[in-house]
Amino acid sequence: MNTEQYDIAVIGGGPAGTAAAIRAARAGLSVIVFEKGKHGRDKVCGDGLTPRAIGALNELEIPLDDAHYIKGLRMIAGKRVRELDWPTTERFPNHGAVWPRRRLDTALMDAAAAAGAEMIYETEALPIMDGDKVLGVEAGVGPNARKIHAGLTIVAAGAVGKV
């Protein structure tokens, strides 16, 4: 197996991994992202976006045209109900949104690819270690196996990741 060289290898193609890939690829770095799931996967309870998340997506120039905007929060505890507006800051909008996670992930994955990141789906990747130093990743099996050396390896595998 030949060793390939990239500036950045990312383990995990969710919002954190793809956001990092978008920024790095737009800056001209060579980026490869390994996502063990399919392109545009769904995630339970992943549809809600806070104003902070919307601000981050705006910075990445991810359009939210079909999102359902929400202007506040409703908290229910027993018979008590309390409604609050989102706090307003200069950095974040004064609204949240509901956007199906499948659409969010698809938009971010597509933006990373459009920026120049190489996106690899349905392939698990694990770090290559030299003592306590990460050299890159190994991914895939058999004829699809790849060995990547990277100047920086980002682990964004989420809560269920093996890393």
Predicted regions and their residues:
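Small-residue (primarily alanine) positions within well-ordered alpha-helices
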Residues: 16, 20-25, 112
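Predominantly flavin-linked oxidoreductase catalytic cores and closely associated redox partners
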Residues: 111-163
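A conserved beta-strand/loop capping segment in the N-terminal third of enzymes
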Residues: 54-107
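Short, mixed charged/polar active-site loops
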Residues: 3, 76, 81-83, 144-147
